[in-house]
From Swiss-Prot:
Cofactor: FMN
Protein name from the UniProt record: Dihydroorotate dehydrogenase (quinone)
Organism lineage string: Bacteria, Pseudomonadati, Bacteroidota, Flavobacteriia, Flavobacteriales
HAMAP family attached to this UniProt entry: DHO_dh_type2 (MF_00225)
A GO CC annotation given for this chain: cytoplasm
Principal location class: membrane
Length: 340
């Protein structure tokens, strides 16, 4: 029903406006008595064989929602009822910021893709913390970034501020230095600034009574040499793992009229490359750290490929928009079928 009726209707409207409409609809729907139970019965797959223990955390299933969908932690309780094993909120910055000018979100229907240049629009870390106080036992990742106005030489201060503010309210952290939509942000992926940032966060982490896993989210556009640097940095800084991958700046093979819009490309065109990055990291590191696989998962088979390539968990975003919540159930059922 989603692909034949709901999606064609939603796709007639501006993608950013319909995103907020869907948010409000789901929030109101879940307030109806019995609605949450209905969604759980329709989409959740409960089976002990789906449970995963990764970087010291217990996941009820390995399928999560990637950052960017619930930026301000407004809907994580409702979204979890659709069958996700975990929800990643953000990207969150210390101060609120509006992001880039609209229009900044584009559907590429012929490519089953999206281009976004949102620019870390969010209400700031304090607002996110206040909403996470209402968590009803959802496993939460906190994706953190820097404010646009913060120069790179002071970026560490932004990341540590959000880390401290979110610490008691998330289960793991994601350091986002790979979005193409904040000027010069990707320069923080360079070896020395990245080591400095991660070492600083790890020192803060180690001072806590119970440290939290810190993950690094990387771009799909890194060269093999840069990926080898990532492996070295992860092992040297002793962070918990990697999320592979963020959106791409590549436009290879696109057909849609919006293909030349500036921003990060997500969806099916990213499927192959993100899996290649996962496989490279897994093989070259000899599976030294866990990987969350994300990028172009539109079918259960796409998710299986990432798990077989070396991912411990997977995340959805664009595939969730194009395929609907049934995709979560399909993936979990396929994992059981494959015995993974």
């Amino acid at each position: 029903m989603y692909k034949s009726l709901i999606r064609p209707t939603l796709f007639k409207f501006d993608p950013e406006e319909i995103h907020y409409f869907t948010f409000n609809f789901l929030r109101k729907f879940c307030k109806i008595p019995g609605a949450t139970s209905y969604l759980k019965s329709k989409f959740q797959v409960k089976d002990a064989r789906l449970e995963r223990e990764v970087f010291g955390l217990k996941f009820k299933n390995p399928v999560g929602l990637a950052a960017g969908f619930d930026k301000d932690a407004k809907l994580y309780n409702e979204l979890s009822s659709l069958g996700f094993g975990f929800i990643e909120v953000g990207t969150v910055t210390p101060k609120p910021q509006p992001g880039n000018d609209k229009k900044r979100l584009f559907r590429l229907k012929e490519d089953s893709a999206i281009i976004n240049r949102m620019g870390f629009n969010n209400e700031g870390v304090e607002a996110t913390v206040n909403r996470l106080k209402s968590n009803k036992n959802v496993l939460i990742g906190g994706n953190i970034g820097k404010n646009k106005a913060t120069p790179n030489e002071h970026a560490v201060e932004d990341y540590t501020y959000s880390f401290e503010a979110l610490f008691d309210y998330v289960n793991y952290f994601v350091v986002n230095v790979s979005s193409p939509n904040t000027p010069n942000l990707r320069e923080l992926q360079d070896k020395e600034p990245l080591k400095d940032l991660l070492n600083t966060l790890q020192k803060k982490n180690e001072q806590k009574k119970r440290p939290k896993p810190i993950l690094l989210k990387i771009a799909p556009d890194l060269t093999d040499e840069q990926l080898m640097d990532i492996i070295e940095i992860v092992q040297e800084t002793k962070i918990a793992g990697v999320i592979a991958t963020n959106t791409t700046i590549s436009r290879e093979g696109l057909k849609s009229e919006n293909k030349n819009e500036m921003g990060g490309l997500s969806g099916k065109p990213l499927t192959k490359r993100s899996t290649e990055v996962i496989r490279f990291l897994s093989e070259k590191s000899n599976k030294a750290f866990p990987i969350i696989g994300v990028g172009g998962i539109h079918t259960a088979e796409d998710a299986i490929e990432k798990l077989e390539a070396g991912a411990s968990l997977v995340q959805l975003y664009t595939g969730f928009i194009y395929e609907g919540p049934a995709l979560i159930k399909d993936i979990n059922q396929k994992i059981l079928e494959k015995g993974l």
